[in-house]
């Protein structure tokens, strides 16, 4: 048994079988990918890795299985069948992230069939080939369970609540959020009132779903509000988005040299991590000169000029606004970023798909009295000339 100390959860135990996976090079690669990408350019202490986050998710996932079974009086055999798979799904769920995480997917790859969740599924198969199968792992369902818990691609397990613990596509209440909504603010230096313990301990299994006590409706809303606030004010901070735009331009310019799209589909993907930034920055290769110049601008804080931030509805509306307002700037020098800030359920209440215990009548459900989604646009001049 190995114990790893985590700043959020204390000592996390891994048995001998789990340690084989924990020590795999694909998992260790997560140490070379920052959890919050370029956020450290604005919040310097936000430099933690996806490895730390994945440890936390695996811990909460295992604990959640125990609590659900205890609260619901389910037989112990469920524990051995699902506990390992859920814990490993938590550990593996971010394996497919590329350099600087979402920038790599959203700007460079732009292919839903090769997104980080799908890459995580492929990497899980590679890891099991390398680690091999012991008696404990010999069942055919293990690999399939873990992959579907990370990112479901079939309807085979839609009615199995254990597949909603790591990635909950039904109502977005999952252990991925439970960890990063605690971990990220600690590293950024923000106070955060969100604690998932009450939600976890007031969760139950009912048929094919995880349901919750009505007494935690305010805690659930707090989770969605905290996520909304972090996305709007921190993760999508105007300077962070600007630097992400510049990094995206640098990576796209370097794509012919690194061939990101093809490499991301092969085992060579293991070599792609955040070190790509320093590789380009320190390179004398002429093929990377444009990319290097963009990164030098980031380093020297010679950033693209922000022209406008506001709400939008349609692309055509944005383009018309740009054409009418910035006639003195070359069309090729103007770029814009669109963002949606919501509570995980589009324009509707995040509680719409959350099921509560029906035999509780003494608690009123707490909801958000606000607009659930906001569409924003940021417009930039990449040449910094007017």
Question: How does the language model describe each region?
Answer:
Residues 1-87, 95-386:
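Histidine-centered, transition-metal-coordinating active-site segments
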């Amino acid at each position: 048994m190995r114990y790893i100390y985590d700043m959020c959860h204390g000592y996390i135990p891994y048995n001998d079988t789990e340690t084989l996976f924990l020590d795999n090079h694909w998992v260790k690669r997560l140490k070379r990918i920052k959890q919050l990408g370029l956020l450290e350019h604005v919040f310097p202490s936000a430099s933690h890795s996806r490895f730390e986050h994945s440890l936390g998710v695996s811990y909460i996932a295992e604990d959640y299985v125990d609590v659900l079974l205890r609260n619901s009086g389910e037989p112990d055999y469920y524990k051995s069948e699902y506990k390992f798979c859920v814990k490993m799904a938590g550990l593996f769920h971010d394996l497919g992230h590329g350099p600087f995480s979402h920038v790599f997917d959203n700007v460079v790859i732009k292919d839903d069939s090769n997104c980080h969740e799908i890459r995580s599924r492929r990497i899980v198969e590679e890891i099991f080939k390398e680690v091999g199968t012991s008696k404990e792992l010999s069942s055919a369902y293990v690999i399939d369970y873990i992959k579907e818990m990370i990112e479901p691609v079939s309807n085979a397990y839609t009615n199995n609540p254990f597949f909603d613990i790591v990635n909950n596509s039904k109502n977005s209440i999952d252990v991925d959020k439970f960890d990063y909504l605690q971990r990220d603010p600690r590293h950024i230096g923000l106070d955060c009132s969100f604690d998932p313990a009450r939600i976890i301990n007031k969760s139950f299994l009912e048929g094919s779903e995880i349901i919750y006590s009505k007494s935690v409706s305010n805690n659930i809303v707090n989770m969605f509000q905290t996520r909304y606030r972090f996305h709007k004010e921190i993760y999508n901070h105007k300077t962070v988005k600007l630097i992400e735009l510049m990094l995206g331009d640098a990576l796209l310019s370097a794509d012919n040299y690194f061939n990101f799209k093809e490499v991301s589909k092969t085992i060579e993907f293991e070599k792609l991590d955040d070190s790509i930034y320093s590789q380009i920055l320190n390179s004398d290769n002429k093929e990377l000169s444009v990319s290097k110049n963009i990164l030098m601008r980031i380093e020297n804080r010679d950033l693209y000029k922000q022209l406008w931030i506001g709400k939008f509805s349609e692309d055509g509306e944005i383009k018309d606004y740009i054409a009418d307002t910035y006639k003195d700037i070359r069309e090729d020098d103007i770029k814009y970023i669109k963002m949606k800030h919501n509570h995980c359920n589009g324009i509707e209440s995040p509680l719409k798909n959350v099921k509560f215990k029906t035999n509780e009548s003494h608690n009123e459900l707490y909801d958000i009295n606000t607009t659930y989604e906001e569409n924003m646009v940021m417009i930039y001049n990449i040449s910094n000339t007017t």
